[in-house]
Amino acid sequence: MRLYPLVWLFLAACTAWGYPSSPPVVNTVKGKVLGKYVNLEGFAQPVAVFLGIPFAKPPLGSLRFAPPQPAEPWNFVKNTTSYPPMCSQDAVGGQVLSELFTNRKENIPLQFSEDCLYLNVYTPADLTKNSRLPVMVWIHGGGLVVGGASTYDGQVLSAHENVVVVTIQYRLGIWGFFSTGDEHSQGNWGHLDQVAALHWVQDNIANFGGNPGSVTIFGESAGGFSVSALVLSPLAKNLFHRAISESGVVLTSALITTDSKPIANLIATLSGCKTTTSAVMVHCLRQKTEDELLETSLKLNLFKLDLLGNPKESYPFLPTVIDGVVLPKTPEEILAEKSFNTVPYIVGINKQEFGWIIPTLMGYPLSEGKLDQKTAKSLLWKSYPTLKISEKMIPVVAEKYFGGTDDPAKRKDLFQDLVADVMFGVPSVMVSRSHRDAGAPTFMYEFEYRPSFVSAMRPKTVIGDHGDELFSVFGSPFLKDGASEEETNLSKMVMKYWANFARNGNPNGGGLPHWPEYDQKEGYLKIGASTQAAQRLKDKEVAFWSELRAKEAAEEPSHWKHVEL
C-alpha cells in the first residue's frame, strides 16, 4: 500500500514537468486525431507528435495520374501514432537513402504504398492554449523517385526552437511524375500533392499551435528543388511566407523537362502498353497493379548512370514538366519576368555535392581514385541526361576544369567539382541572383563539415557531401550517440539560423556569426567548424557556364522554344 504516495508523487511530477496525463487529441477540419507525447532530454515541455495524418484521398484507381482530392472526413478519433507508408518506390533505394540520411538513433521499419499522402506534425505548443508558433514544412529529397517524411524526425528542431515542424509526403517516380504532355496526364502530380499539403497546413495548423500566417517551406536535394519550384508556382501563392532550398533548385536541369513524351512512351512500352495515343497509354497504365508499375520503375534504372546506351536516349530521372499549371513557363522565363513568390529565401550548397553519395548511388566508376583524360571526357558525355553538356562543348569544359593537371587523382577530384558545379553550385547562385534582383531578401550559404554519423564506407577526404547539413538541421547530435561538442554546437547554431529565419525572414540573431544578405556584393555564409562570412560564391564558375550555355544556344537553337505547351 505504501506505493500509492509514490504513484501520486510521480503523476504530480509529470504534470508539473509539463507531461500531460493523457495523450494529445487535436481537431482537424476532417476529424479528430490522436497523437503521443515525446520527451527530449533537457526539455520540460514535451513535443506532441502526430504521425500519418491524411491530407488527401488515397490516390488510387481513377485518382492515379490525377490531382490530389480532399481527404474523406471521419467521425471517430483517428490514431495517428505510427509512421505512414512511404510512397511507392524501389524498396532497396528507399531503405539505403533513409539509413544514410536519418537523424534517428534506430532505423524505422519501412513500408511502401501507393496510398501515401500523409504528413507528420511535431508541435511543442501547449495544446490547451492558443499558441501561434512559426511553422516549418519539410519536403524530403530523393531525386523525385525515392524518400519519405518519416526518415526525418522533427522533434529536436521543434523542441529546441519552439516551432511546429510538419514533414510531408508526395507521390514519386511514375506515380508522381508520369506525364503525356497533354490533358490526359499533365504530370507534376507530386508537386500538386505538395500544394495540397500546404493547403492542409493553412486549414489545420492553428489547432496544433502553429501560425498559418508564418509558414516556411524547406527541403533538401529534390526537396530543395521542389521548394524552388513552389517559389515560382502561382498555385502556391500565399501558402507559405519564407523558403529554404538546401542543395537543389529549379534550375537543376536534370529534374525538369519541356518534353515528357519520350519517357512517357518508354514507360508505356516497358509496361506492355500501346503508345498509339495518350488516352490509350493512361488508360492502360491505370489498370496496372502497384507491383506491376514498380517492376516498370525498376526497369527504368532511375538515378543510374547508363554507361552503355546512347546518352541522348537515356532517362535517369522522371522530371518535373513545364505543364502550364504548376509552372506556367520555363523557370528561366519566370525568373527573368520576376513573376514569382518573392518571399525571403535561403539557398545553399555543400562543399562537395558530388563527393561520395551521389556518384555511389548513380554508379559512377570513381572508386579507383583516379581518372584519365579520355575516361573523364567519356563520362561527361555519358552524363548528358544529367549535365546537358553537348558533345561539341566537352573539350571546352574538359580544358577549363582539367587543363591544368596531368595527375589522374587530381583530375578525378576536378571531375567531381565539375559535376557539383553543374548540378548544384551554378544553378543555386543563378536562382539566388534572380531572387535578389526581384527585390526579395536572399541569403546564401556553403556548408563544409563531416558529420560523425556518416557511413564508414565514405572516404575521409569527403567533407560537406550532399546531405551532410541534414544532421545539423534536424539535430542528430541530440538523438544519436557519439557527437563531439563541436558537432553539437554546430547543430544548435544551424537550427537557430533556420528557425530565426522561419520566425522573421532573417537568420541572424544574438550570439550567431553575422550572415550577410545576398546583395550586389554577394556576401554569403560559410558554415562549418569555423563559420564566417565570405563573398561571391562560385562567381567564376557561373561566368564560365553562363557564357558556355549562351554560346551553345546561339549555335544550336534550343528545341524547347518551339514546343507547343
Curated annotation (Swiss-Prot):
Family, as annotated: Belongs to the type-B carboxylesterase/lipase family.
Description of activity control: FAEE-synthesizing and PNPB-hydrolyzing activities are both inhibited by DFP.
Active site per UniProt: 221 (acyl-ester intermediate), 353 (charge relay system), 466 (charge relay system)
GO biological process: acylglycerol catabolic process; cellular response to cholesterol; cellular response to cold; cellular response to low-density lipoprotein particle stimulus; cholesterol biosynthetic process; cholesterol homeostasis; cholesterol metabolic process; circadian temperature homeostasis
Tissues where the protein occurs: Detected in liver, lung and testis, but not in kidney (at protein level).
Motif segment (Prevents secretion from ER): 562-565
Subunit structure: Homotrimer.
Record's function text: Major lipase in white adipose tissue. Involved in the metabolism of xenobiotics and of natural substrates. Hydrolyzes triacylglycerols and monoacylglycerols, with a preference for monoacylglycerols. The susceptibility of the substrate increases with decreasing acyl chain length of the fatty acid moiety. Catalyzes the synthesis of fatty acid ethyl esters. Hydrolyzes retinyl esters.
EC number: 3.1.1.1, 3.1.1.67
Mutagenesis / variant outcome for changing residue 492 to E: No effect on the hydrolysis of PNPC or PNPA, no activity on cholesteryl oleate. Increases activity on PNPC compared to activity on PNPA
Reported pH dependence: Optimum pH for FAEE synthesis is 7.0. Optimum pH for PNPB-hydrolyzing activity is 6-8.
One Pfam assignment: COesterase
Protein name per its UniProtKB record: Carboxylesterase 1D
Entry keyword annotation includes Ion transport: no
PANTHER family per the UniProt record, alphabetical: CARBOXYLESTERASE
Keyword Nucleus: no
UniProt subcellular location: Endoplasmic reticulum lumen; Cytoplasm, Cytosol; Lipid droplet; Microsome
PROSITE patterns: CARBOXYLESTERASE_B_1 (PS00122), CARBOXYLESTERASE_B_2 (PS00941)
Disulfide bonds: 87-116, 273-284
Glycosylation sites: 79, 489
InterPro entries: AB_hydrolase_fold, CarbesteraseB, Carboxylesterase_B_AS, Carboxylesterase_B_CS, Type-B_Carboxylest/Lipase
Keywords: Cytoplasm, Disulfide bond, Endoplasmic reticulum, Glycoprotein, Hydrolase, Lipid degradation, Lipid droplet, Lipid metabolism, Microsome, Serine esterase, Signal
Single annotated GO MF: retinyl-palmitate esterase activity
GO cellular component: cytoplasm; cytosol; endoplasmic reticulum; endoplasmic reticulum lumen; intracellular membrane-bounded organelle; lipid droplet
Signal peptide start and end residues: 1-18
Post-translational modification N6-succinyllysine, affected residues: 382
